[in-house]
Amino acid sequence: VIGGDECNINEHRFLVALYDPDGFLSGGIL
């Protein structure tokens, strides 16, 4: 759903981590 630079690290990092454990990796936390 969320990926790469489009990911707002400030918000989506934890949202995606909760909804999609795999997605948060694409969110840009790492």
From Swiss-Prot:
GO terms for cellular component: extracellular region. Expressed by the venom gland. This is Snake venom serine protease. Inhibited by diisopropylfluorophosphate (DFP). Snake venom serine protease that catalyzes the hydrolysis of arginine esters, kallikrein substrates Pro-Phe-Arg-MCA and Z-Phe-Arg-MCA. Cleaves kininogen analogs to release bradykinin. Induces contraction of the isolated rat uterus directly at high concentrations, but provokes more forceful contractions when injected in presence of bovine plasma. Shows capillary permeability-increasing activity and hypotensive activity on the anesthetized rat. It is found in: Secreted. Its main location: secreted. It is an enzyme of class 3 (hydrolase). Residues 1-30 form the Peptidase S1 domain. Its EC number is 3.4.21.-. Belongs to the peptidase S1 family. Snake venom subfamily. It comes from the Eukaryota. N-Glycosylated. One of its GO terms (molecular function) is toxin activity. Monomer. Negative results: has no proteolytic activity against dimethyl casein and fibrinogen. Keywords: Disulfide bond, Glycoprotein, Hydrolase, Hypotensive agent, Protease, Secreted, Serine protease, Toxin. One of its GO terms (biological process) is regulation of blood pressure.
